[in-house]
Amino acid sequence: MSESRPKQFVAVLDFGAQYGQLIARRVRDLNVYSEIVPCDISADELRELNPSALILSGGPASVYAEDAPKIDPEILELGLPVFGFCYGQQIMAVTLGGTVGHTEKGEYGPAHLTRAGESRIFDGTAEQQTVWMSHRDAVSEVPEGFTVTASTDVCPIAAMENAAKNLYSTQFHPEVNHTECGSQMLSNFLFNICGFEKTWTMDNIIEQKVEEIRQKVGDGRVILALSGGVDSSVVAALVHRAIGDQLTCVFVNHGMLRKGEPEMVEQVFRKQFNVPLIHVHAEQRYAELLAGVTEPEMKRRLIGTEFWKVFFDEAQKLDGVQFLAQGTIYPDIIESGARKTGGKAATIKSHHNLIPFPEGVHFDLIEPLDHFFKDEVRALGVSLGLPENLVYRQPFPGPGLAIRIIGDVTPEKLEILRNADAIVREEIDAYNAQLFDETGNRNSEHSVWQYFAVLPDIKSVGVMGDERTYARPVILRAVESSDAMTADWAKLPYELLTRISSRIVSEVAGVNRVAYDITPKPPATIEWE
């Protein structure tokens, strides 16, 4: 469904910035649609996309390096409003005839900015303010027609503009929270300079997506692999709103879900939303498949391959199915090589939602979330009426508990881990809920982003009552993160850790010890396998 971007949108040219996705999200937070495109896009290709404004991202390179990313000079002559950040300011300067050089010392972190003269970018902001810098190079001479609009002690040209041509730029990063007036600057650019309207709202999005799905599907039938995760659940609710019983969801229960999950899927989709749902009980099939398998990647491969076999077995029993809906989201597209921009961006990792169609079987794809970031998917789910405990649930890997059991997967180990994990989630859910009540922020500084139990393939000696025990330990993993790229272990209160440990040892048969994994990512990964 990626062909239908809004008429007015911002194209973010990505020069390799660590904040590239953040820029796009900040624009969307202001109710304007934005899309990331590769920096080597040509002016002709950009003209075909037809954006209403451009943002040039930062990047790690020096503009004079041999392999430094460049911009097609004609892009700056298209007559579009342009806002460049950091490297974006530098590339704008050198492309238009200015110069960039090394500063005497780099500028990293908070910096004291002083405005110089009037600028529409700085409307409504203080004469002096704190901004976030991350650079060694800086513009030393502005192009013809440009004026300097702000400076710092280290960077005399901290912002510049050619207002007549709607070209604006800053050496600092307006998109990060540490720039105290960054949101105001973005707002000034979008609404005062570009004249955007706030059309990127959930109500508008739902109305638009429902109409798109109806137009594409017509009288056809759609099938969806429903996992109970956030993405597939939101797709199910959205597609069902559009076409009702023309949608059939297939829920493959591989026996490695968390406690209560199959029941929750049944409750929400069969009873609350009245979605046609096929619940495939494949627990025994998977138990036989995984017997004796210990290598993590083999577990993943077997589970994934078998999932699609089971799914397509069910799909082929249904008559008239033409479409397959799935929960591809925008970061998937970016990480798989910027599919929507001609595949020019480097591939970071293979797309996790690629479908292995059996020979002779093919469905047209419907991907209604492929323009959305994860936080937008959650907001969409709430607007569609999905319960918040489903929408705001933490990430859960497709192979399920199988990759949180170190070694082979057995019914006994699954039972132990499922019960221990339920206690971990219950206790930390309550802790996060308390933080939300106190702060009103689901992502407050101390909230836990992901948390679960791991069952290692060892036993340990213990004492329970007057008797020696030889039972399994459980490892608690709880991390703080925003994007899973990096993570730190959560500094949970001792009282909470004590309660979790006591409950697991007391309530879960076969466990006599609880350990807490305090390793950040990197060097560790969040999951153990």
Residue ranges and their predicted role:
Residues 175, 329-330:
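Catalytic metal-binding/acid-base residues of hydrolase active sites
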Residues 1-53, 60-66, 70-71, 76-78, ...:
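RNA-binding accessory domains that recognize and position tRNA/RNA substrates
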Residues 82-88:
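Conserved helicase ATPase motor motifs in RecA-like P-loop NTPase domains
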Residues 326-328, 334:
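Extended catalytic-interface subdomain
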Residues 57-60, 329:
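Short glycine-/small-residue-rich Rossmann-like dinucleotide-binding loops
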